[in-house]
């Protein structure tokens, strides 16, 4: 069986031993300088290949364990960075104005850049205050509430750039298009937003950081994780629970305000609960 090669590169026998995995583990961490989470993602693929070969009877059956690691602390945009990015530009400069609108949209929805790039005018229901997100990582469309502060920003943008000559919105058109009015893909849109950030003196350029920022501020303000799960489009609570754990220290002001111990008062030798109205 050792003569049979996997992918014409690797003999299958290496999948039968822990020795190669240990060496590969060190190679990834030390030479490629990947973190533990990236390492785990790589080894999940490795394990899937090994289990497939076991099912086929090509190699001996054994258990392959992957040690869970604590998620890294999520970086977010700071208050000062957000303030710089939210300074409103002139509507005449389409690209800068469009990017400013997208930053506002990120802060209102926490959507992924792929969802933003595929958003159409018809997905925006201003009467009901609903946004339909048709493109998501989990492939399940969702309907989320449109923040009141976001409405006039989107309406003004659409009136300037996404209406026909009669002032009627182009319902089938993409909201955040390129300079020619055509669809702007997530990669191109992300690159443009990165340039926008740098032009405002913000060195962080990742669009995904806006999801982390949204989640952190949601948790800070006392928002529940079930609603956060729906808004962010996660199928399970696992990821939002991670957000909750990562940003637990940021809930201290809420603990100080709402913890029952802070509402207890001593009166004439008796302890009473004083509920705030």
Task: State where each predicted segment sits.
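Catalytic-site neighborhood detector that most strongly recognizes the C-terminal catalytic loop/helix
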Residues: 76, 135, 232, 236-257
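N-terminal core-binding DNA-recognition domain of tyrosine recombinases/integrases
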Residues: 1-73, 91
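Basic, Lys/Arg- and aromatic-enriched nucleic-acid-binding interface segment
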Residues: 84-113
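Conserved tyrosine-mediated DNA breakage-rejoining catalytic core shared by Y-recombinases
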Residues: 109, 118-153, 163
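Active-site/catalytic core of tyrosine-dependent DNA strand-transfer enzymes
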Residues: 147-202
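C-terminal catalytic core of tyrosine-transesterase DNA break-rejoin enzymes
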Residues: 104, 108, 195, 211-235, ...
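C-terminal secondary-structure termini that scaffold catalytic or DNA-interacting sites
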Residues: 258-277
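Flexible interdomain linker/hinge and immediately adjacent N-terminus
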Residues: 58-87, 134-137, 177-182
